[in-house]
């Protein structure tokens, strides 16, 4: 939901709370938990999970390896769940024509740098850039070029945005900021 008026444009940014992240976090958690429980079952010699038979699996070396992969998967799954819980990457882009200021805000992991906030003047914005790479894994990203700074992405690099949407967003941003568009 974009909030836009003649002088102010606030664009919310979706963070890590996406359906795909929930899906992969669940799949990874269940799979790694299964690996870990089968490895532990092979150690005790009993089936802890009725559906997964561990009678033919020796603890050394298969059970140890399954426990290791299960623990590694649980750590990766907990990382994914933490990014979802803290909504890492979410925030907003705020363009204020009256004050001539652009503010970019994102949430990070807890700690000193939990709030990531960038502020700069609109007159320092040189252009809006679009990076479009087609192929097996297409990449379509919208950047804002600012004097004396590196290009700042306005869209997430992992989002699968179609070509029409990225072009419309680039045109809308350039029109509001009154800058040119460059594609590469």
Curated annotation (Swiss-Prot):
The chain crosses the membrane at residues 21-43, 58-78. The keyword Transmembrane helix applies. One of its GO terms (biological process) is photosynthesis. It is found in: Plastid, Chloroplast thylakoid membrane. Keywords: Chloroplast, Membrane, Photosynthesis, Plastid, Thylakoid, Transmembrane, Transmembrane helix. One of its GO terms (cellular component) is chloroplast thylakoid membrane. PANTHER family: PHOTOSYSTEM I ASSEMBLY PROTEIN YCF4 (PTHR33288:SF4), PTHR33288. NCBIfam families: PRK02542.1 (NF002712). This is Photosystem I assembly protein Ycf4. The lineage of its organism: Eukaryota, Viridiplantae, Streptophyta, Embryophyta, Tracheophyta.
């Amino acid at each position: 939901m974009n909030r836009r008026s003649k002088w102010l444009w606030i664009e919310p940014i979706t963070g890590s709370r996406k359906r795909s992240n929930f899906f992969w976090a669940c799949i990874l958690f269940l799979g790694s938990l299964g690996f870990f429980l089968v490895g532990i079952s092979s150690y005790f010699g009993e089936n802890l999970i009725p559906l997964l038979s561990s009678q033919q699996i020796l603890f050394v070396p298969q059970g140890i390896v399954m426990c290791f992969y299960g623990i590694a998967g649980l750590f990766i799954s907990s990382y994914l769940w933490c990014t979802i819980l803290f909504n890492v990457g979410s925030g907003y882009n705020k363009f204020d024509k009256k004050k001539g200021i652009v503010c970019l805000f994102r949430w990070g992991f807890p700690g000193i740098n939990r709030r990531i906030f960038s502020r700069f003047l609109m007159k320092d914005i040189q252009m809006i850039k679009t990076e479009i790479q087609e192929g097996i894994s297409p990449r379509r990203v919208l950047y804002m070029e600012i004097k004396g700074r590196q290009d700042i992405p306005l869209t997430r690099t992992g989002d699968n945005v179609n070509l029409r949407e990225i072009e419309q967003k680039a045109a809308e941003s350039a029109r509001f900021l009154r800058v040119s568009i460059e594609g590469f």
